Amino acid sequence: MSATPQQLNDFLRRLHLGSEVYYVGQLCDAWHMSTPGGSDATTFHLVCHGEAWIHMKDGSEPARMTAGDIAFFPHDAAHTFSAHRVIPQQPFDYSHPAPLDVHAPGSGLLCGHLRLPAHIRRLMLASFPEFMLIHPEASPVGHQMRSLIEMMTEEATRNELGVTAILDRLSDALFLYVIRHALHMEPKLSPLLATLSDDHLRPAVAAFIDAPAEAWTVERMAGLACQSRSAFSERFTQLVRMPPMEFVATWRMQLASGMLADGNANMLDIAMKCGYESEAAFRKAFKRIIGIPPGKARGN
């Protein structure tokens, strides 16, 4: 058995990314804005035109951004975004931004965030660095990213019906392109895909993804990986940053979330499709991993 790209695409398709663009505007002179970080959001900044500088709180060298560049913060690390290499001392009010104008002096910015469930962040982003600066012209997916960025920039200059909703949905696409870019550069950045690029783990993980409703144990997965139970568990936990059975439960609960979102499936049927013989055991696992009872997730 093998985990086909379509299976992974189906996993991503079921995700509700919920991207929101919270700032679009034209900035001039000695502007700067800071975020304390520490939230459960994943954030990004897009320079539509002009330039900007990113200052991390660890004292590292400021990073320069130019038109089309993306600053990506998988774990909402604290940072300051400014017009110049040196952060101005005077306060700056960006609560009432001027409309974006790509022909005006200064810089045009588009900032957004998305709030992935904690279990999804662990599967997808746990190994990502605090900060990624992406130059599309140097990216393996640069052509697609540039086309999307041009579309977002053009849309951000409009004052028409649906602009906010369109920018939010385009931000979903931008997030996926950022993930694609990152995995082209370093396949093991994503704990989920790290298992499928590891010769020792791939047979076991692929078999589970093919048949999540079957009875899975560490012993069974280790056998498929031709490893001892302890060696398999150690390697798996090191790569994925969670034990094998926690991964199994997390994957199953994401499948369950998709089925519950449809609103019509029987709870026991969902439980059995996710490898649980009783509805009570399924409800307990769902609440532990997702954070809410499955009944509240139905139809969301």
How should these model regions be labeled?
Residues 110-119, 125, 130-206, 210:
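An amphipathic alpha-helical interaction segment
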Residues 47, 208-211, 260:
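Short helix-to-turn junction characteristic of helix-turn-helix DNA-binding domains
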Residues 173, 177-183, 203-254, 271-296, ...:
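Basic/polar phosphate-binding segments, predominantly the helix-turn-helix DNA-binding elements
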Residues 62, 215, 264-265, 280:
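Residue at a beta-strand N-cap/secondary-structure junction
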Residues 85-109, 119-131:
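Double-stranded beta-helix
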Residues 1-72, 77-100:
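Generic protein-terminus/edge-of-domain signal
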